[in-house]
From Swiss-Prot:
Induction: Repressed by high light intensity due to a transient decrease in mRNA stability. Also down-regulated at lower light intensities by low temperature or limited carbon dioxide supply. The light-harvesting complex (LHC) functions as a light receptor, it captures and delivers excitation energy to photosystems with which it is closely associated. CP29 facilitates the State 1 to State 2 transition, where State I is induced by excess photosystem I (PSI) light and State 2 is induced by excess photosystem II (PSII) light. The N-terminus of the protein extends into the stroma where it is involved with adhesion of granal membranes and post-translational modifications; both are believed to mediate the distribution of excitation energy between photosystems I and II. The modification Phosphoserine is found at residue 103. Keywords: Acetylation, Chlorophyll, Chloroplast, Chromophore, Magnesium, Membrane, Metal-binding, Phosphoprotein, Photosynthesis, Photosystem I, Photosystem II, Plastid, Thylakoid, Transmembrane, Transmembrane helix. The gene is Lhcb4. The modification N-acetylvaline is found at residue 2. This is Chlorophyll a-b binding protein CP29. The modification Phosphothreonine is found at residues 7, 17, 33. The chain crosses the membrane at residues 143-163, 176-196, 244-264. InterPro entries: Chloro_AB-bd_pln, Chloroa_b-bind. Residues 10-37 have a biased composition (Low complexity). Coiled coil: none annotated.
C-alpha cells in the first residue's frame, strides 16, 4: 500500500527528490517612539520630570525651579522668605485682677529682596535672601573656575605649585618670565583698587538680573542675548560648572594640607601610590 501526501506550496520536485522552499513571512517593523524631545546623540532622551538634588525628596515651596540650576537644595531653609509675627499689645492695667497678653494678630511675609545703590557694601535688603544667595554662589563659582584653571596652568608652565606662589612673589614680581618693577605691597594695592573698584561699580546696579548677567561687552559673541531658551541653558551650564569648580578647589586645599603639594604634585603622588600598590 502506498500513501501519497499533498505537496505543500513552494515545494519543487527534482529527480525523485523533494526540496522545500519556505514561504516568505510578513514582518512588521517596529518604530521606536519617545515621549521626550531629542536634542542630543543616539539614545538621548530629555528628562521630563522635576530634577531634584536627591531622589525621593520634595521641592521646597520657595524654590519653584525658575532659577538656573535650581534643584530644590535648601535642607536648612536658609533661603526661606522671612515671616514676621504681629502680636497685639498686652493689657497693662495695674488695677485689673488679671492682664491678658497680646495674641497673634497676623503673620506678614517680608517683601522680596530689594537692591539699593545707596549702600554699595551691602546692597541687598535681606541678608539671608534667595536673590543674594544666588548672586554670591554665582560670583564665588566664577572665581573658583578661574582659580582651578589658573592653578593648573601656572603649575604646568612654571613648575611652582599654587601653594608656593605667594613666596615666589616675595622674591620679586614677574610675569611671563619678565620682572615687574613692583613690590608685593604695591601689587596688593593695585589689586585692591582694580577689583574693589569693579565691585563698587557692579554694586551700583539695582537690577538683580543684570548684577549677575550684565551682558553687553561681557557677551561679545552674542551667545545669550537673543534666544531666552538658549540663554537659560547656558546659565544652567555655567552654575553647574561653577559648583563643580568650588568643590574642586576645596579639594585643592585638602590636598595641600595633607600632602603639602599643589594640584599637579598631589596628582603625581596619588599616581605613584597606585603604581606602587599603596593605594591612597
Amino acid at each position: 500500500m502506498v500513501f501519497k501526501f499533498p505537496t505543500p506550496p513552494g515545494t519543487q520536485k527534482k529527480a525523485g527528490t523533494t526540496a522545500t522552499k519556505p514561504a516568505p513571512k510578513a514582518t512588521t517593523k517596529k518604530v521606536a517612539t519617545s515621549t521626550g524631545t531629542r536634542s542630543g546623540g543616539v539614545g538621548y532622551r530629555k528628562y521630563q520630570g522635576d530634577a531634584l538634588w536627591l531622589p525621593n525628596t520634595t521641592r521646597p515651596e520657595w524654590l519653584d525651579g525658575s532659577l538656573p540650576g535650581d534643584r530644590g537644595f535648601d535642607p536648612l531653609g536658609l533661603s526661606k522668605p522671612s515671616e514676621f509675627v504681629v502680636i497685639g499689645v498686652d493689657e497693662n492695667d495695674q488695677n485689673a485682677a488679671k492682664n491678658n497678653k497680646g495674641s497673634v494678630e497676623a503673620i506678614v511675609q517680608a517683601t522680596p529682596d530689594e537692591v539699593s545703590s545707596e549702600n554699595r557694601l551691602a546692597p541687598y535688603s535681606e541678608v539671608f535672601g534667595l536673590a543674594r544667595f544666588r548672586e554670591c554662589e554665582l560670583i564665588h563659582g566664577r572665581w573658583a573656575m578661574l582659580a582651578c584653571l589658573g592653578a593648573l596652568v601656572a603649575e604646568a608652565t612654571t613648575g611652582v605649585s599654587w601653594v608656593e606662589a605667594g613666596k615666589v612673589e616675595l622674591d620679586g614680581a614677574s610675569y611671563a618670565g619678565l620682572s615687574l618693577p613692583f613690590s608685593i605691597t604695591q601689587l596688593i594695592w593695585i589689586e585692591v583698587i582694580l577689583v574693589g573698584g569693579a565691585e563698587f561699580y557692579r554694586n551700583s546696579e539695582t537690577n538683580p538680573e543684570k548684577r549677575c548677567y550684565p551682558g553687553g561687552v561681557f557677551d561679545p559673541l552674542k551667545l545669550a542675548s537673543e534666544d531666552e531658551e538658549r540663554a537659560f541653558r547656558l546659565k544652567t551650564a555655567e552654575i553647574k560648572h561653577a559648583r563643580l569648580a568650588m568643590v574642586s578647589f576645596f579639594g585643592y586645599g585638602v590636598q595641600a594640607l595633607s600632602t603639602g603639594e599643589g594640584a599637579l604634585g598631589s596628582l603625581a603622588k596619588f599616581a605613584d601610590g597606585l603604581n606602587n600598590g599603596k593605594g591612597l
